[in-house]
């Protein structure tokens, strides 16, 4: 759940940044209404229970509802929707409006079976992409912690040039507190 909350809290900090852009014609205080976060878990037996607990604490997931089959037909996936007003940071502390957190529209897709990453991407683009018709999609792996303005800068690349079809952000190693992560040769390199 640490990796998940690191990523999710980073996304929510980015949404707060979009909402702080009061002079923008696109964003502003209600900018969160233009953003939907889709979380796709690859297999009900594979997702860590503490990650589900983190999603439940945010109001996005409800335990005990998912069934293997309905009307004698196998279930492919379980979809939960919720607009949360709290975030869990990577230390598992709640952050709300008093800490600058804005609401976040979430869709959580819990796939019944592990069908791997490419299948999850198909779910995202073919199911949720068709339903939501987004202008910009940003894919993040769990554990990635976006800087507080990173998603804005990615969005801006698309906004400024309609010929842009794809963009990639810069990935930096997390150096840790007091840069202690640099003692690890993989991080230091």
Curated annotation (Swiss-Prot):
GO CC list: cell septum; plasma membrane
Subcellular location: Cell membrane
InterPro entries with a match to the protein in the record: Chitin_synth, Chitin_synth_fun
Catalyzed reactions: [(1->4)-N-acetyl-beta-D-glucosaminyl](n) + UDP-N-acetyl-alpha-D-glucosamine = [(1->4)-N-acetyl-beta-D-glucosaminyl](n+1) + UDP + H(+)
One example of a Gene Ontology biological process annotation: chitin biosynthetic process
Enzyme class: transferase
GO MF term list: chitin synthase activity
Membrane topology according to the record: Multi-pass membrane protein
Pfam families, A to Z: Chitin_synth_1
Keywords linked to the UniProt accession: Cell membrane, Cell wall biogenesis/degradation, Glycosyltransferase, Membrane, Transferase, Transmembrane
Homology family: Belongs to the chitin synthase family. Class II subfamily.
Protein name: Chitin synthase 2
Species whose genome carries this gene: Xylohypha bantiana
């Amino acid at each position: 759940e640490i990796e998940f909350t690191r990523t999710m809290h980073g996304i929510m900090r980015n949404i707060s940044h979009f909402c702080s852009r009061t002079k923008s014609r696109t964003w502003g205080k209600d900018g969160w209404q233009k953003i939907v976060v889709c979380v796709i878990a690859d297999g009900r037996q594979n997702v860590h229970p503490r990650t589900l607990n983190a999603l439940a604490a945010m109001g996005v997931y409800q335990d005990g509802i998912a069934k293997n089959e309905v009307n004698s037909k196998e279930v492919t996936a379980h979809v939960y929707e919720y607009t949360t007003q709290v975030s869990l940071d990577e230390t598992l502390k709640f952050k709300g409006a008093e800490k600058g957190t804005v609401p976040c529209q979430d869709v959580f897709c819990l796939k019944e079976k592990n069908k791997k990453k490419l299948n999850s991407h198909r779910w995202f683009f073919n199911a949720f992409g068709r339903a939501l018709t987004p202008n910009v999609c940003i894919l993040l792996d769990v554990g990635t912690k976006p800087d507080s303005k990173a998603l804005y800068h990615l969005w801006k690349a698309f906004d400024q040039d309609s010929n842009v079809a794809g963009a990639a952000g810069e990935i930096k190693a997390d150096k840790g507190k007091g840069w202690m992560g640099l003692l690890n040769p993989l991080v230091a390199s």
